[in-house]
Amino acid sequence: AQESRGLGDVYKRQKELGVYTVTINASNIDGTTTKDVSVEVVETMPYVVKFPTPSYLQTSTDRYTFADRPVFLRPLLEYFDNPRFEWSVDGQVMEGEVERMFKFTPSAPGEYTVSCTVSEDTPTEKISRNIDKGKTAVTATVKVVCVDKKEQDGFRASGSSKLWNKVYEYTPAPGQFINETSTIGGMTGNETSPEAAVAWATQRLKDKLHVSLGSFGGYIIVGFDHSIPNSGNQYDFCVQGNAFDGSSEPGIVWVMQDINGNGLPDDEWYELKGSEAGKEETIQNFEVTYYRPEGKKMDVQWISSDGRNGWVDYLSAYHTQDYYYPAWISENSYTLTGTCLAARNTQDSQTGYWDNQSYDWGYVDNFGNDQIEGGSTVDGSGQRNGFKISNAIHADGTEANLQYIDFIKIQCGVLAKSGWLGEVSTEVFSFEDLTK
């Protein structure tokens, strides 16, 4: 073992299979705490290959599309170090398709079974007398449904309101306004189920009060009583935030068509590209896993898919709720995936004030050049950003060419914190169709 600052003892490798108990002792001037942790040494890592669902609370991995419109399939992986990929459609291996993301374009209506076999491309390694690390392979399948209709067949005629009419899901990341029952946060303390969280968010938006999305990856999904058409080069809809000069907390915009016609946001999400799309520092498919704190008024720990780790600070000077981890998330950890922008927050060394700088265009709650006139630029009240459906892109960055949309998802697009201001967290107030 070796001593490492902030970590204690670091143990390298056990040579025998089995479950080992590691005892951790932590002490300071206030006393000593002891905790036992079980570590299992296994012969083969529990490799996982699975396809994602359209949102955290949904369970089906089925994908929907129209004939000649591609879907981009990318499995989630656990424990792989050097994965190799093999794709097949209805049992036929797709020669040359060896990347993690597979572009599948059905030419005719029907159901297709797409399989991805992932192997650990590592020569057999003798770890110890009883433990070998060798090649393993895991297969996951996903059903792709090519619906028997044209895109225009799903367009829903203009409804009675130009405003959003329903919140379908509210899954924020941990943050200082989550579970907050003061007049600032506005929660009641009874938001202990996804349904209750949606009801709360619905009422907040009706009152045009802010709904916080927490740290990176937190999101809200809303819909309208009609489809919003692609008007060409004009702004098709807008989202109200509270950005002002020096206070931008950008939210990524995703849109969806109700391809399967069931009235639910369980189809394909398309990102609306903004000014940062395609830049080297912008990371697609970025994952952050948040962990439930073991006690009250504690920071929320996280790890990210690029190997970083950190925490969402608990700000005891400003908020009194026990936990920043959403009370309606039953699991002890959850992972949020999306597009992550490079942070633009800086602190003035003289005054100590933080500046959350803006991005050019394409993001919610952002003091960019796509703002709709009418909002205050002093405190952000009524601040709105305009968005074009023509900016919808596929996962590979190519244009999606959508004729209309039915659902909108806003997702916090930055993993950062600004000292005493707390985490960078997108806030939304309202959604409006600008084509009516």
Stretch-by-stretch model annotation:
Residues Y79-E86:
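Solvent-exposed loop segments of extracellular immunoglobulin-like
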